[in-house]
Amino acid sequence: MSRSSEDKQIEIYEFIKEQIIEKGYPPSVREICKGVGLSSTSSVHGHLSKLEKKGLIRRDSTKPRTIEILKEPIVPKEMVNIPILGKVTAGTPILAVENIEDTFPISLNFIPSNKDLFMLKISGESMIDAGILDGDLAIIEKTNTAKNGEIVVALIDNEVTLKRFFKEDKHIRLQPENKNMDPIILEDDSVSIVGKLAGIFRRY
């Protein structure tokens, strides 16, 4: 093995450790590419395979972001597993999946402390002008109240939707953040707030 190849493996190994310590979870292959200055994901896969053969890391090929450091203990910053409850349509509401699909580990540094949180998958484009895109994971703080202008998860006839909330004279207005879409106007007693937006996670 050339010295440059071995040096690159050391650099990748150290980058993975730093990311786990900083974020609490390992980087993706593309993030490793960017972090160590490689343009080819296949090169990164090759280096990871060699690190795995050396017993320095362990991977699960069936799951993303499952690189585990084996040779030395890494203590990530305090973490919490947020349940992913299903899919919320940012457009036409669809029936929400109430059971937990998965959990997502995230450092407490990146979320509000002492809050009851869950995540929902975004599908649709009604919130694109607020920077919320199809495929995003929305981090939601559980609450049944909201102030005007806050982005909320609203329950309508056992369906959920993500919109900006406005309580007006005789109704509730759920406003999309897409100039091509109309607001949803509802009677006060026909909509319930189940949470408000605390953050967005996006995979690139």
Curated annotation (Swiss-Prot):
Note the site residues: Cleavage.
A90, G91
Q: Which residues does the entry assign to the active site, renumbered to this chain? A: S126, K163
Species assigned in the record: Clostridium novyi (strain NT)
Describe the reaction catalysed, as an equation: Hydrolysis of Ala-|-Gly bond in repressor LexA
The function of this protein is: Represses a number of genes involved in the response to DNA damage (SOS response), including recA and lexA. In the presence of single-stranded DNA, RecA interacts with LexA causing an autocatalytic cleavage which disrupts the DNA-binding part of LexA, leading to derepression of the SOS regulon and eventually DNA repair.
Q: Where are the transmembrane segments?
A: none
What name does the UniProt record give this protein?
A: LexA repressor
Q: Which family does it belong to?
A: Belongs to the peptidase S24 family.
